[in-house]
Amino acid sequence: MKVPFSWLKEYVDIDVTAQELEEKLFSCGFEVEELIPLDAGISKVVVGKIVEMEKQEGTHLTKCVVDCGDYGHDIRISTGATNMKLGDCVPAALDGSTLPGGIKIKARKMQGVESNGMLCSGEELGLNDDLFPGSEVYGLLILPEDSVPGTDIAPVVGLDDYIFDISITANRPDCQSVLGIAREVAAVLGKPLHMPAMDYKTVCEPDAPITVKVEAPDLCPRYMAHYVRNIRMGESPRWMKRHLALCGLRSISNVVDITNHTLLEMGQPMHAFDLNKVAGRTIDVRRAHAGEKIVTLDEKEFTLNPNNLVICDAEKPVALAGIMGGANSGMDENTTSLLFECATFARDCVRKTSRALGQNSDSSARYEKGVDRHSPELGLARALHLIQELDCGDITTLEYDLTDGRPMERKHIVTTPAKICGVLGITVPDQTMIDILQRLEFTVDVQADGSWDVSAPLYREDVESFPDLAEEVIREYGYDHIVPTFLNTASVTNGGLNYDQKQQLKTKRLLAAQGFYEASTLAFYSNAELDMLHIPADDEARKAIRILNPISENLSIMRTLLAPSMLNVIVDNLKKGNTEGRLFEMAPVYLAKELPINEHPHERQTLCIGAFGPEEDFFTVKGALEALAAGFGLSFDYKRETTPWLHPGISAAVYCGDKRLGVFGKLSNEINGELEIAKDQKDNQNIYLGELDYEALMSCVDGELRYQPLSPYAAVKRDLALVCDEKTTCGEIEETIKKASPLVGEIKLFDIYRGANLDEGKKSMAFTLSLSDPKKEVSAEEVERVVKKILGNLKFKLGIEIR
């Protein structure tokens, strides 16, 4: 959040520099991400008074003699501007000066005439009319007549200021405003806080009745509104324009600026409804009806549902509560009567609606973090004061304050000084703690028994118990008072990884060695992800646990498979131009025994592998699995199995012995065609996925690996070209070959052939067999005997012939 240094000074008598204040804010828990000087990039630019002017013949230039005080009383500078006159004070960038954007100014000849600098426009100094009047005029920036020649330009045009870009943590929504930060500044400096004026007077009665009602008090705990007649649209005063500009907003009109100013100053979002556009002069806060539509001020149309909270008139929605007003009720130059709204909306409702619709605003950002129920009262009072001060309209006596019925009371925490010091681990004097809490607008009532009854300000909803009070004390007292000490106990155990953690780390390293990078995704998605993989309705993966309070509808169920998340990551990479990669994720999936759940679900550790790219193939993933098996001293078998999301002819189930571990293969052509990626990517990309039950895999690991010496006898290699039916799988052939003899070691498929010299429905598969005996050299006779047995088994079991 951007907070101008000069605006803070309006509430607190600050006697430190911006840099010193940055350090103090950091010490009390507020990170200043950036301290931005407004005069950044500007040097050696001063006030210059034009004392002589002469038109340069044959050119569009004017030769000026400029008085720049101590820098020289007769500096000659040529300019192409025409809006200046003799005696004007203008910004003069002298020889060796710099301007925003890294522009360096040097003395040079302009069409044959020496020019020792440059006379500047407001734009060249990074100014606009909101920051300094006249800055957007075409030509030079004309400064006030009383400007002193030679004075640095920054204070003259208001650039002697800083912007604090402060990171506001989620637990401090009360600091989402300039006033909120000013409270903290006042406390840390020990200075009084000067509150902005919030008094106003009603001057007339309403010309017609207005109906305001709240049908969803659970989503709108407080709704305040005030009717203002005879609206007078006009320009905002300079000070307000500057406030808005320093925070990154442009001035629009006095009334619109007041609502924006209240948001920035008080942290209270506001909206104003043009009552001439509100049907039935009725405002109703309710849940949207299914299918209702609204066009917001930014001209975007949204279709709503009952999860969305809306502000409606007698006929239609006129605002998305807490997010943005509707185009059908916004003010314009013809507006004459307005109903100003200040409210508190449920943060979860605003967040979900904002994310579901993809619609964000400064208001929604504040409501998502939280706006306390006292804030609308202060915000509305401040806005009405500004309306009266700027003479924007006539404030009527008609106002509304609708609540959910809960009392608005300060939280009370009963504690003792000893408890607070016990949390801190240091001793802080009682009076020091009381002073700190009172500076932070807490009240401390010391009881007869020595305990404290501490009440928190209404805006401090984050304070719940005495440890919170301890935090308030130490961040103001100073963390540097806490002296590091050694533990006073010898019963400290050595850290280390347990067996499961070591196995997981080993798995990750084995996959990393194969060129795979680890991915990390959220533990939830939606049924749309399961639909994307064509998971059948009766599949176990459909028994997903629904989240009662999801972040959004697309994150509404706990995941039952990792593959959908992995595919989303791959698609996201492809959309962003990353056309190849190898990824893995090791994470739990959540499986319910029955729905609705009545016991804790099983969190099954799962391993998912993904590879994508034009050069990736089936053996990329198979090779990674083989490396994994070898690393744990296992042997995997592969069997044909149909999986909804994998290509039926380029996929397999993975087994370790009789235990099924999972599946892997190429993404099915149908699903590949449905992916939201460019057509050329669909045509050129190969996407492979695999998902294994990691717990089942680890159950196959027999403790630590045992040393097996290499055989001193060379293995005998033998190639076999086999003709088989098209439906016969490589796994079936390998399994039959292995069972023929214990001498059979490694089996590698090196060729598949279909075509001439083969009958229809037949294919040729060529394997290299490795035959060895750890105790002796394998003889030629033994090799022939084993090969003969292999061929016999293949013919008997699978009908396979030697080619």
PLM regions: where:
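Phosphate-backbone binding interfaces of nucleic-acid-interacting proteins
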Residues: 1-202, 206, 339, 358, ...
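Conserved mixed alpha/beta core segments that line enzyme active sites in large multi-domain catalysts
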Residues: 33, 47-78, 242, 246, ...
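Beta-rich nucleic-acid/ligand-interaction surfaces
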Residues: 39-43, 200-202, 491-492, 496, ...
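Terminal amphipathic helices with adjacent charged low-complexity linkers/tails
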Residues: 185, 189-214, 391-420
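Glycine/proline-enriched, intrinsically flexible loops and inter-domain linkers
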Residues: 5, 23, 53-55, 189, ...
